């Protein structure tokens, strides 16, 4: 797949500890323009997208249903009449494990656009074509069950699977660490020339970055096991033992730790003292 379509970006004015400099809304092509991630519901941001596209938006693509990516869809779709493409609704694409946890009432929900629905659902490998670009949908769950990346020639728009400035939040039941590793492996096997993350600058050396992220998660799992050697604890307890970060970031760290614990439980390395919930106490298996 070789595609030299023009790529432009409009940075949303939503910087934060979780979004970095803000959400990147990408515009692909010139004669017919595809917008990847309209971003937050910010009128000035949507106007900036419309101005840059010069009235030629034909497709609206959404990597996943978090408010900083999908909340602007309705405003942009109303202005352009362009169809909206995504994997599915906000709760779509969950692994069987995460679907079962959601049914028990386990809540993640950070920034989820619960009412999001695309006009057209995409599946892994499907292609969208225009007169000057071809985009292939890649199902890349991990950060969220219905997360899509989009392949344009030797470039991949990777949403929040890979960030240009930090690691991604994995918050069950939306996020799944097992899926995350599989998705990193998928991108590595595709060997893109460049990754365009939804937050941060383009990644010109994708393979080292993908390897770095996988190694970081493996190290975090090892740290959690070491922390459990000191005694059982909840995800919050373990996060406090492991992380040295500002207090306002600790809730996200606790969700990441829970994701690791669930993956370690699948491997038989840890066990909880009851049904999975946010305040479940965990210990080393057999301990």
What are these regions (language model features)?
Residues 2-52, 149-164:
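Conserved beta-strand hairpin/beta-sheet module of binuclear metal-dependent hydrolase folds
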